């Protein structure tokens, strides 16, 4: 029979043996000792208000966060470590290569209460400036409304359509050239996005939006991220409320479809040019072009 005194000594002997080369095996009839493992806590076309969510703790919101959200895409590999904020050198390229380069990057929006929303870009459109009959800057036309298109690369150009919806563009290299963001794959803050979308929807506000409906269109993504006219002419490389992070992996060339832009039928031959780019097979894309997909594969 083992006395209580001996029972009390067993843990001390075990603790002293920890860190030595090898533990002595238990004698026959005596159970092996074990330690508890600590577990981590569970955790449209080129042609607004912030969510009332309980604020999360804010330390110092001076720069972009360095950790991605919990959502993992099946169309891109998972992040390996921290994501990097993209600066002027990324945006300073012509509209077409920039529109392609946007695919796979992560757009981040920090709300006033500290909540951060993230979405991976899966669809864009390039607008080439004065020569492009579908661009707001066609013919070199510059107005207070489209001034962001003529500012340095990385400047936001946000305009309103139908008197109530917003579209978000980013200026590129070349006067009057820019890239329209058409669709995102939601990554982080989906419930806040859903709340923002529902607040601004008409008629069907009672229907719960599916994840793939949150950001599948230029105005939808602006609603989901609370992007409005106040963001016009902001610098995406410097702003503290909205920025771009480098995605873990850009889609390979065969995965990128080049198709005609949407809603620019008035632009003659420019309406048919393949200046819209999207990730093949992504359910978050706003408009799928099967003919263009076949041409891309050929």
UniProtKB/Swiss-Prot annotation:
MF terms (GO), sorted A to Z: alkylbase DNA N-glycosylase activity; damaged DNA binding; DNA binding; DNA N-glycosylase activity
Assembly and binders: Binds MBD1. Binds SSBP1.
Nucleotide-binding among keywords: no
Record flagged with keyword Chloroplast: no
Enzyme Commission no: 3.2.2.21
Family per record: Belongs to the DNA glycosylase MPG family.
Name of the protein in its database record: DNA-3-methyladenine glycosylase
Organism encoding this protein: Homo sapiens (Human)
UniProt main location, coarse: cytoplasm
Single biological process term from Gene Ontology: depurination
Transit peptide limits: 1-17
Highest rank taxon of the organism: Eukaryota
Subcellular location: Cytoplasm; Mitochondrion matrix, Mitochondrion nucleoid; Nucleus
Residue list for modification Phosphoserine: 78, 252
Function in brief: Hydrolysis of the deoxyribose N-glycosidic bond to excise 3-methyladenine, and 7-methylguanine from the damaged DNA polymer formed by alkylation lesions.
Reactions catalysed, as given in the entry: Hydrolysis of alkylated DNA, releasing 3-methyladenine, 3-methylguanine, 7-methylguanine and 7-methyladenine
Taxonomic lineage: Eukaryota, Metazoa, Chordata, Craniata, Vertebrata
InterPro entries, A to Z: Formyl_transferase-like_C_sf, MPG, MPG_sf
Listed Basic residues bias regions: 9-25
CDD domains according to UniProt: AAG
Pfam family, one: Pur_DNA_glyco
UniProt keyword list: Cytoplasm, DNA damage, DNA repair, Hydrolase, Mitochondrion, Mitochondrion nucleoid, Nucleus, Phosphoprotein, Transit peptide
CC terms in the record's Gene Ontology section: cytosol; mitochondrial nucleoid; mitochondrion; nucleoplasm
Record region (Disordered): 1-65
SUPFAM superfamilies for this protein: FMT C-terminal domain-like (SSF50486)
Activity regulation remarks: Binding to SSBP1 in mitochondria inhibits glycosylase activity in the context of a single-stranded DNA (ssDNA), but not a double-stranded DNA (dsDNA) substrates.
């Amino acid at each position: 029979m083992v006395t209580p005194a001996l029972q009390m000594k067993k843990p001390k002997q075990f603790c002293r043996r920890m860190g030595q080369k090898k533990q002595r095996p238990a004698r026959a009839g005596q159970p092996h000792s074990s330690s508890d493992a600590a577990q981590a806590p569970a955790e449209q076309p080129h042609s607004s208000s912030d969510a009332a969510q309980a604020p999360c703790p804010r330390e110092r919101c001076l720069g972009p966060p360095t950790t991605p959200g919990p959502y993992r895409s099946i169309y891109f590999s998972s992040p390996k470590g921290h994501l990097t904020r993209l600066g002027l050198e990324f945006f300073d390229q012509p509209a077409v290569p920039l529109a392609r380069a946007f695919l796979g990057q992560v757009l981040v929006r920090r709300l006033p209460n500290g909540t951060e929303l993230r979405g991976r870009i899966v669809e864009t459109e390039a607008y080439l400036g004065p020569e492009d009959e579908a661009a707001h800057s066609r013919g070199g036309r510059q107005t207070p409304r489209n001034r962001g298109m003529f500012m340095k690369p990385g400047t936001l150009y946000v305009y309103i359509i139908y008197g109530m919806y917003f579209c978000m563009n980013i200026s590129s290299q070349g006067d009057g050239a820019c890239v329209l963001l058409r669709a995102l794959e939601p990554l982080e803050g989906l419930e806040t996005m859903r709340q923002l979308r529902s607040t601004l929807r008409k008629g069907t506000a009672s229907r719960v939006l599916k994840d793939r409906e949150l950001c599948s269109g230029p105005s939808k993504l602006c609603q989901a991220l609370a992007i409005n006219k106040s963001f016009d002419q902001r610098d995406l490389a410097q702003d503290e409320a909205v920025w771009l992070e480098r995605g873990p992996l850009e889609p390979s060339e065969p995965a990128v479809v080049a198709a005609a832009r949407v809603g620019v039928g008035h632009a003659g031959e420019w309406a048919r040019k393949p200046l819209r780019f999207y990730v093949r097979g992504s359910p978050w894309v706003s408009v799928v072009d099967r003919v263009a997909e076949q041409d891309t594969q050929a």
